[in-house]
Amino acid sequence: MQNYNAKSIEVLTGLDPVKKRPGMYTNIENPNHLIQEIIDNSVDEVLAGFASKINITLYEDNSIEVADDGRGMPVDIHPEHKMSGIELIMTKLHSGGKFSNKNYTHSGGLHGVGVSVVNALSTRLEAEIKRDGNVYHIVFEDGFKTKDLEIIDNVGKKNTGTKIRFWPNKKYFDDIKVNFKALKNLLEAKAILCKALTIKYSNEIKKEKLTWHFETGLKGYLDHKLEAETLPAEPFIIDNFSNGDSYLDAVFCWCEDLSESIKNSYVNLIPTPQDGTHVTGLKNGIYDAIKAYIEKNSLSVKNIKITANDSFAQLNYVISVKITNPQFAGQTKEKLSNKDVTNFVATAVKDLLTIWLNQNPDEARQIVENISKVAQKRINADKKTTRKRIMNTTIRLPGKLTDCISSDVNSTELFIVEGDSAGGSAKQARDKNFQAVLPLKGKILNSWELDADTIMNSQEIHNIATAIGVDPDSDDISALRYNKICILADADSDGLHIATLLCAMFLKHFRKLIENGHIYIAQPPLFRIDIGKSTFYALDENERDTILTKNSKLPGKVNIMRFKGLGEMNPAQLRESAMDVSSRRLLQLTISDVYDDTEMLDMLLAKKRAKDRRDWLENYGDRASVE
């Protein structure tokens, strides 16, 4: 082992940190997040009042172009760095004009890494800027400038804007193909949240053109998305509420049918799928208003005390805040962390909702009744759990479960493994200190259209529920026995089928576990590749080919082994490729803010949707994957 001293320390400069660890800066499943970074810059121009149009074009060569009619990126020379503003923005992390409020009052591009990350992870990037009566052009390849900034044309001085076209580098992404549905949902959301914005979308691959412009903004949005009955019948709307520097737009209603649940949050029009302080403020404000209304009107039910979670359980909402200095947890801007936003949103929501409740007593009482029912179910579930604990000082765990030594729920893991054979290998491959293994026999029951009592008649599902310590259809996960619950199935089509059924079961009957980040899908390899003394694992044919290409100059004989299933792997191979914390690949199961997960699984698994399923398979079946 080499000595660890000052010489061992690496200092990554320029865009090297992004290229070295791209997953720290963007979502590497596909280029969608890169597109969003550029769109967010254009939206910032709209929010600042300098733009009203954004055009997105997807080309057949997998390049993407985003153009706006904003002020145009700066092209003058920076006094300190001695390079043009556009080159500085593209090649230096943490450079930008949004760290103060001089140029943008409300912006999402705070970290100053967005567009430079796009440049770093692209084989080529071209920027065209219309500014000061000129059209400027500059080119980058692999993050480096290859063509100096030059004037290529002249335009009227009022004709301004920025156009960026980039080609994602496939070596940094699982797939360089854009997820069209996710992108279109994002664009629609941007247009809904920004009344002044017109977005045009052109997909040359699918020969599709769309335009979004919503003069009414959030008004009627939930009506459009929700088919079930809601309370209130007309969703409650907060329109452009301001305290001076911050602005709040929100629309929400309660709906007993949770299959269509909509919970979307945004900061300066950037989606925050992991929520944050603005959603906490919404939750607190609603709870405070409901609680005060119950006390004022003596509507409390004996022995039932509602909580903030009770008032939020059946809520469908879209909340959008515009603030001057957004702070996010992480570079991908998925969770807002500004503490002052909680109080701003909570105060506004409480005051406005209180007025509405007093003005609409009939609907207000119905809302209180529904929330009280939710609280009653929670209390009953808590009592049931308490009785179980009293009756069973030691939980009677399934006989097939090989448990771990540790009882620290923050560190333990359960692998639900397809097949007894693979289960045996997994038991030998695991770290017995914190990893438990539960083998499944055969295909699991399709539980999508079944209730909790029915699915518990299935021995396999009963074993899963008992092992993890959570009852199906329960919001109480206080007895959860493992921090990570990992689905480990074969990498072939049968394994994907089983993984899909398990994902559907967790989404339908153990949703709280997904919402709290406890469900994962292990990604075992389909191939083992030995090149001389080096060993690689590949998830599929594409990754196999990429590995072979990247390592074509390595000395030694090439040997490729295809695993027919987990059972073909010896414990050492299974440990290294699927279970070892340092080398495995886990995919966290999440509830998307842009995909309609429930609708997709309903179409795939519901008996009544046979025709829809057949149509979908004919059109998109070759692109299906478990996500």
Swiss-Prot record:
Residues in Toprim domain copies? 412-525
Give the keywords, sorted.
ATP-binding, DNA-binding, Isomerase, Magnesium, Metal-binding, Nucleotide-binding, Topoisomerase
- The EC category is isomerase
Residue positions binding Mg(2+) 2: D490, D492
* Signal peptide span: none
The record's catalysed reaction(s) read:
ATP-dependent breakage, passage and rejoining of double-stranded DNA
What Enzyme Commission number(s) does the record list for this chain?
5.6.2.2
GO cellular component entries: chromosome
Matching entries from CDD domains are given as: HATPase_GyrB-like, TopoII_Trans_DNA_gyrase
Q: Tell me, which GO biological process terms does this entry list?
A: chromosome segregation; DNA topological change
Q: Which cofactor does it need?
A: Mg(2+); Mn(2+); Ca(2+)
Q: Where does ATP bind?
A: Y4, N41, D68, G109, L110, H111, G112, V113, G114, V115, K333
**What does the UniProt cofactor note say?**
Binds two Mg(2+) per subunit. The magnesium ions form salt bridges with both the protein and the DNA. Can also accept other divalent metal cations, such as Mn(2+) or Ca(2+).
The record's annotation in PROSITE patterns points to:
TOPOISOMERASE_II, TOPRIM
Q: What modulates its activity?
A: Pyrrolopyrimidines inhibit both GyrB and its paralog in topoisomerase IV (parE).
Q: Which InterPro entries match?
A: DNA_gyrase_B_C, HATPase_C_sf, Ribosomal_Su5_D2-typ_SF, Ribsml_uS5_D2-typ_fold_subgr, Topo_IIA, Topo_IIA-like_dom_sf, Topo_IIA_B_C, Topo_IIA_bsu_dom2
Q: Name one GO molecular function term.
A: ATP binding
**Residue numbers binding Mg(2+) 1:** E418, D490
Identify the Pfam families for this entry: DNA_gyraseB, DNA_gyraseB_C, HATPase_c, Toprim
Which HAMAP family does UniProt cross-reference here?
ParE_type1 (MF_00938)
The UniProt function text for this chain reads: Topoisomerase IV is essential for chromosome segregation. It relaxes supercoiled DNA. Performs the decatenation events required during the replication of a circular DNA molecule.
Q: How does it assemble?
A: Heterotetramer composed of ParC and ParE.
Q: What is this protein called?
A: DNA topoisomerase 4 subunit B
Organism from which the protein derives: Francisella tularensis subsp. holarctica (strain LVS)
